[in-house]
């Protein structure tokens, strides 16, 4: 955590505010090279400079050539603890180099005018922070909810104009909505609160906004992973104040590329499958008179296997078994990361994937023999990687993405096979990002 705070302080050292044209020129002559390299890596510097210049140019057209800041908030990848957060278990996640960036112009009114590539957002007046049923599931509700969360805690908010673009994959387990929430929270923190609000506090406000204003049940995993930076070990046993530990670690330092593969399977009509996972887990915990599975032990579960089979279901028992072994595995993964033990870490990643496939059962869709893309991706990963590397289903499962740690020497072969099967650009070679939401300039 100390390293992450030091890095964040350096990145947030903005210097004099510049108009957008001057920021573009500063990027062209290399004045932001060091910061951009820190965020995205040396090999991505050229492409990121082009990206930033294009976003700034569009912002100038929309917002005028005003004094501005650039903000960035990362997506995340789940590393361990598949479907454990909703049972108040342990999780390991990491911030990644795919992010949402925004050019922001402060205003002296209460209006947030937010422009984003690909969709339109109505202006939000922060004088009205009431919950609006008509805004359910909208970007406007998230902005209003974050502002409400700030004011409830005694923080300041104010207006701004912004233009943003994101390369965080929507629906791929990278938490694009949480990245947006962290972005807005970081903007309010820097513009109106002297950047004094902690990453953890910004994450909690984002969760509040999503639950209460966006009206979607959300744990704290996504927001915390996007806000804290680097690898983060989380323990949700204390629901209101989860324990979060940032762990500096980079698989690339040990010869592995972190690759997510989007199998291009539709999430449509899968809501029942997703909701069945926490429902069945909680049905088991209820049998023990507990709210969630983290409040029982593996020995208690095993001793009551017959009762669970009779009174709930076989699958519910298996999913509970997955949770209790997976939450402990996440703890062991965090310990391996702290000790820089890549061998143990990768073994645990494979064990996590095995448990998700066998016991959690979120790889195959029941009754659908025509659509088993995640299973195919895992089979191909096993073929290429063998015993060197690791692979697992990533995120909610049933569709979406798988995660693999691929030796550098096999990366080209791995990506080629995946693209031949699932289509061009289905693979995302990720870089671990050592900080969460920041003000770049």
Regions found by a protein language model. Give the residues of each.
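Structural signature of FAD isoalloxazine-binding scaffolds in flavoprotein oxidoreductases
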Residues: 90-108, 228
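Beta-strand segments within the central parallel beta-sheet cores of soluble alpha/beta enzyme folds
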Residues: 113-115, 159-166, 196-208, 317, ...
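Alpha/beta catalytic cores of group-transfer enzymes, especially the acyltransferase/condensing modules
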Residues: 194-242, 352, 378-381, 391-394
